[in-house]
Amino acid sequence: MFIDYSKILKKNLKNVLHEVLVIIENKGLKEGHHLYITFDKNHKKLKIPNWLKNKHKNNITIVIQYEFWNLKVQKNEFSIDLSFNNTIANLTVPFDSIISFADPYANFGLQIAKDNSLKKEKKEKSKIHKNKIINLDKYRKN
């Protein structure tokens, strides 16, 4: 049985952000703390206004600090209202779309590998294992 450490680690990194957001949802954001959350704008379950999606190439970074409302944290996603140039936008962000998050006040940040990089890593490991197979037939006595 293959133990997929990358998958386990990625799941637990997302759980750190999930727990932080639950704390903020229940108790608010303490003075000084602020989060930078970067996510893949092309994730299939991401729900953001088109004008915001069109403004960015691949990834979007949001800041949760002063002007945010209605933070709701679910098992697989969170939703939040944020102000962009005096326009309120509702975002629903799946945890699977998260690339990184940081709290500069706490000097804390995490980088979360994308799924396709994990698949590439597995493929490379698979090639390595195939190359280590030794055919013993030539060493056998008849």
Language-model regions: role of each:
Residues 71, 96-97, 113-117:
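Short, intrinsically disordered/low-complexity patches at protein termini
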Residues 6-92:
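N-terminal recruitment modules of adaptor/scaffold proteins
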Residues 93-102:
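Phosphoinositide-dependent membrane-docking surfaces
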Residues 105-106, 139-141:
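Short acidic/polar capping segments at secondary-structure boundaries
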Residues 116-140:
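Short hydrophobic short-linear motifs embedded
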Residues 104-116:
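Short acidic, Gly/Pro-enriched loop/turn segments at secondary-structure junctions
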